Amino acid sequence: MQHTRAHRCALSALVALTLIPLTACGEGSSRAASPSSASASASASASAAKKPYGHAFQKLERTYSARLGVYAVDTGTGRVVTYRDGERFAHNSTFKAFAAGAVLRKRSLSGMDKVIKYSKKDLVANSPVTEKHVTSGMTLRDLCDAAVRYSDNTAANLLLKELGGPKALNAALKKVGDHVTHMERYEPDLSTWDPHSTRDTTSPRAFAEDLRTFVLGDALGKAERAQLTRWLRTNTTGGELIRAGVPKGWAVGDKTGMGSNYGGRDDIAVVWRPHAAPLVVAILTNRTEEDAKPDNKLIAEATSTVVDSLT
């Protein structure tokens, strides 16, 4: 779709207005992650300015002409690093981790050999695995593998349909305490972000806490949790994101996302450290220009700041 220069500038100005740090660092966390009130935001902004990492995140935003949202928690100490953690961002393909988790929760590991049939008309862009198996169909297990490890869009759509649609995944997330996330569309439409809308958005805090619940908590049984963890740890799409910002020897299980406009780029991860409890990290970003391209270095550098702040 073509846009006039004036329209693009207007949208850019709208996004730029959000470039004000709203959140700070503290001890512990809350499962609820609704946007802050004006007074709370003002207080948090003042607190954030006193934090060394707050300045680092502000610098990254200026450097990359971006809006950056961060929520990270040390699950051993409860210490957190937060920056715009209650603001809404497009979640893009990061939701696929939870689509797989919700299918595991619904079917259990014993039900993952169910074969799902589909046709060529079901295929959408960025479906490197499912496009090879139109004739035979794929098991739920293999669809989860394709969606999480290769970010296969058709696989994700088939998982959503297995659950009952995007709103069914939304309901599944509410059951584990997430009342922030909005799931409304299928791939690839959900990757187009509208700054005026809340559809297909979440907050860094909400998705970090969802990931913690599914991978480290009790949302899944032991076997199902182990399977989801294996998919995340063997993800093929995250080498330049959170994985690039942690020290050698640390293990990362992540799910990435990329928007089709505003340079949207996201990554959510559980990070296992030697001799210490895991970190859970969610970094969601967008650029200020509608036609901007994503830059993986923004997330890698933000991750390095998180690591420095929590270790």
Cite the ranges covered by each PLM segment.
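Structured C-terminal helix/loop/strand segments within mature extracytoplasmic catalytic/sensor domains
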Residues: 2-19, 23-40, 49-57, 162, ...
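Sec/Tat-exported extracytoplasmic proteins
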Residues: 61-64, 72, 101-111, 120, ...
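Mid-domain, small-residue-enriched loop/turn segments at the edges of structured enzyme/sensor domains
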Residues: 67, 160-216
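Acidic helix-start/capping segments at beta-turn-to-alpha-helix junctions
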Residues: 75, 113-130, 163-164, 190
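Active-site SXXK
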Residues: 78, 89-121, 147, 281
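Conserved catalytic neighborhood of penicillin-recognizing serine enzymes
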Residues: 123-159, 166
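Conserved active-site loop region of the serine DD-peptidase/beta-lactamase
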Residues: 209-258
